């Protein structure tokens, strides 16, 4: 097909030498160039927010039953989401029982989840599989559009988080944000 539609070749083009293709010390491709390794060793990307005001860290998690992108879930998929994730229109966040106990919060009870970017009313699901000090929120909920099966169900994780820049690469490293969980 390429022969039929044609292509262009510049007659004076000369490919570079393999020995000069990569301007690194090893002259090979390097995921992290030697010059950057020291800078990357001890850099931990901090979650946005100050610890005294926001003692917990909110992290997202994906569920195979929820689409986490811009597209909405089909209505039959919403019906398969367990009550430990979405109960009626209320989103449940996962909290370790020790963390919940220290906050005076129990299973299924309403709470306010606050971050430097916003706040939301949630319910609490106690889960020993999450590390104490973390709050996990499913992605893929909180749509404001589509239809009656999707709109208004849960909370959009993106409303509670913002970009965090990795100092070494300059890329967004928004893996979580500091948070506070309070009883209602």
Residue map of PLM features:
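Long, contiguous, secondary-structure-rich segments that constitute the structural scaffold
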Residues: 1-8, 68-184
């Amino acid at each position: 097909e390429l022969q039929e539609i044609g292509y262009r070749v510049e007659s004076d083009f000369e490919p570079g030498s393999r020995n000069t293709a990569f301007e690194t010390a090893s002259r090979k491709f390097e995921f992290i160039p030697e010059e950057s390794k020291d800078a990357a060793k001890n850099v931990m990307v901090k979650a946005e927010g100050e610890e005294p005001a926001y003692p917990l860290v909110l992290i997202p998690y994906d569920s195979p039953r929820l689409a986490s992108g811009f597209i909405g879930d089909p209505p039959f998929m919403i019906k398969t989401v367990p009550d430990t994730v979405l109960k009626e229109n209320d989103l449940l966040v996962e909290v370790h029982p020790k963390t919940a106990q220290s906050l005076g919060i129990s299973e299924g009870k309403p709470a306010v989840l606050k971050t430097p970017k916003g706040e939301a009313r949630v319910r609490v699901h106690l889960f020993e599989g999450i590390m104490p000090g973390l709050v996990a929120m499913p992605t893929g909920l909180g749509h404001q559009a589509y239809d009656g099966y999707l709109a208004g169900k849960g909370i959009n994780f993106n409303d509670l988080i913002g970009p965090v820049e990795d100092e070494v690469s300059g890329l967004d490293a928004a893996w979580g944000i500091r948070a506070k969980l309070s009883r209602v």
